[in-house]
């Protein structure tokens, strides 16, 4: 937890130093002050400070290092993000990324991930995908194995959001292989869940159940109710593909019980829709109508 009093003291010390500085030292102080402003969620102040630093570096011309310039531009990006000006923020990061790429700086990968995550928050999954793919390519050559696997998993997640199911399987399997080398059990279960869901969407019920059960096994051992719920859901989709409707319904009802008090409205909605589908397929239209009525009450509030 951030100690606000300490942060205010740091701000005061930085402001006291400012009149006695110039050039790069002054720009660095502005960047530090911008960071403190972001901690306080003061996006407008942070933006003004980061832009001051950027102007100093521009005035220095060739004397300013590309890394320092990239740092100032990144500060502008974070400030714009704090102001919910996400399009401008991602464009700012593009400038920083170009500078970091030219110098092959280690911060390049983190900045690529940041930009990709911002695109993901906005639902621009194609742009997010491009960032994570580049980060994965860099990490594959000279990066950390764990981060390489995480980038691969992020690529799989983007493909999941784009509905490119074969690619989900390909990249989740690649991530799983690296996670397995690192004995990262929790992360493997998320790979298995995504693989299972992709198989269900591709109408391969057997594989959906196979991979869903793997995720469920780990979740049960870890007493991870979120994963138990989601893996039960994807296995139910697999049983539905195989027209084993009672098995599907049993799993959906179990998932429904687990998610009921969570406030995870998207997952609650998905489960209800699958139950309605099962009721229709088994000609239980009264139950389907009742479930649809309940769901409409929820969706008018949360959507």
Segments predicted by a language model, with ranges:
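Conserved alpha-helical positions within TPR/SEL1-like repeat arrays
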Residues: 28-39, 67-82, 106-121, 146-161, ...
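Amphipathic alpha-helical segments of tetratricopeptide repeats
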Residues: 15-16, 51-61, 94-104, 133-144, ...
